[in-house]
Amino acid sequence: MKFIDEALIRVEAGDGGNGCVSFRREKYIPKGGPDGGDGGDGGDVYLIADENLNTLIDYRFEKRYAAGRGENGRSAGCTGHRGNDITLRVPVGTRAIDNDTKEVIGDLTQHGMKMLVAKGGYHGLGNTRFKSSVNRAPRQKTNGTAGEKRDLLLELMLLADVGMLGLPNAGKSTFIRSVSAAKPKVADYPFTTLVPSLGVARVGSDRSFVVADIPGLIEGAAEGAGLGIRFLKHLERCRVLIHLVDIMPIDESDPVQNITVIESELYQYSEKLADKPTWLVFNKIDTIGEEIAAEQAKNIAEQIGWQGDYYLISAATGQNVQQLTRDIMDFIEANPRQIIEENKALDEVKFKWDDYHQQAMQHPVEEDWSDFDDEWSEEDEEGVEIIYERG
């Protein structure tokens, strides 16, 4: 199935039903009083994370999703039925953004997480609500409010422990093939990897971590060169980044310059991502021999001012790969995933009708009663009098 990690959809919550103005009119019950019911609330729109999905492709074809409208109130104090909610299933790791305001509504990072993205309109109030000691026959009501409508940008961000960085042909896909059962395409030309892929690396019988491979970056990616930087978002939730460097590029490019290019593009995309723990790994040491590779790696590290440790591996032959995966596993276990409070602002996400409950009673709609007789007679026919709102 084609990997789609972005989709723009229209979500429309249901409108609230209008309140009803009616009076109880029964024989032998003079002036029975108001009995207009409230309308029903409009339906809401939710997103729910489903671990069985891995792409947003369904939302590329169907763009509009609307919840049900609340029913109008009726006589005899009958409240209108609430509009039907709709729930849209998305892959785990999906972020919802209001495309107009760019407000991040929330992230769905666990299976079964549910999030409100469009709130239904508040129900209108029937005339029963306006009865008081000084207004025994109220002719006021309120109409239901319109449901929220949003242009919603869905972004799928892969959930992985380890993210792979590097130029095209650095050997990222070969590394994933060597440490996991994933089989990304491998070839001797740039941009073999066109979409992100995940692999599960097992260390021993009971330990494992998830590694994400993204298409390689090139100089100018921040301005759209190559495949651009759109896939870097998939590394935002990784705990550690592996910067894989071809120690002796076949195109005779300078590894020092190659490292600088990646760091620059990463920084231009996100300072937060650039500050993540990053390990330097020199690949393809089998092409020049271990001793020459060690000397070359030392010179490169000195030129870029690298202060930490670095690794020399051959993803193709598996040389030193096992030690690297063990060290990665130890790091991950020593640094458990933190529940980043990126969604702290979610508590402050203000939906359109949050204050309507308090304001509705202050602005009622009054019916035009010029055509109706205020005098109630006990001789009237038995039944309920319903006053319908004029078009």
UniProtKB/Swiss-Prot annotation:
Binding positions for Mg(2+) per the UniProt entry: S173, T193
Amino-acid positions noted as binding GTP in the UniProt annotation, renumbered to this chain: 166-173, 191-195, 213-216, 283-286, 314-316
Compartment annotation: Cytoplasm
Record's keyword terms, sorted: Cytoplasm, GTP-binding, Hydrolase, Magnesium, Metal-binding, Nucleotide-binding
Gene Ontology molecular function, alphabetical: GTP binding; GTPase activity; magnesium ion binding
Residue ranges occupied by any Obg domain in the UniProt entry: 1-159
Annotated OBG-type G domain residues: 160-333
InterPro entries: G_OBG (IPR031167), GTP-bd (IPR006073), GTP-bd_Obg/CgtA (IPR014100), GTP1-OBG_CS (IPR006074), GTP1_OBG_dom (IPR006169), GTP1_OBG_dom_sf (IPR036726), OBG_GTPase (IPR045086), P-loop_NTPase (IPR027417)
Major enzyme class: hydrolase
EC number per UniProt: 3.6.5.-
One Pfam family matching this protein: GTP1_OBG
UniProt entry tagged with the keyword Heme: no
Top-level taxon in the UniProt lineage: Bacteria
GO biological process: ribosome biogenesis
Cofactor(s) of this protein: Mg(2+)
GO CC aspect terms: cytoplasm
Subunit structure: Monomer.
Described function: An essential GTPase which binds GTP, GDP and possibly (p)ppGpp with moderate affinity, with high nucleotide exchange rates and a fairly low GTP hydrolysis rate. Plays a role in control of the cell cycle, stress response, ribosome biogenesis and in those bacteria that undergo differentiation, in morphogenesis control.
Similarity comment: Belongs to the TRAFAC class OBG-HflX-like GTPase superfamily. OBG GTPase family.
NCBIfam families named among the record's database cross-references: Obg_CgtA, PRK12297.1, PRK12299.1
Protein's UniProt name: GTPase Obg
Provenance organism: Haemophilus ducreyi (strain 35000HP / ATCC 700724)
Phylogenetic lineage: Bacteria, Pseudomonadati, Pseudomonadota, Gammaproteobacteria, Pasteurellales
Gene that encodes the chain: obg
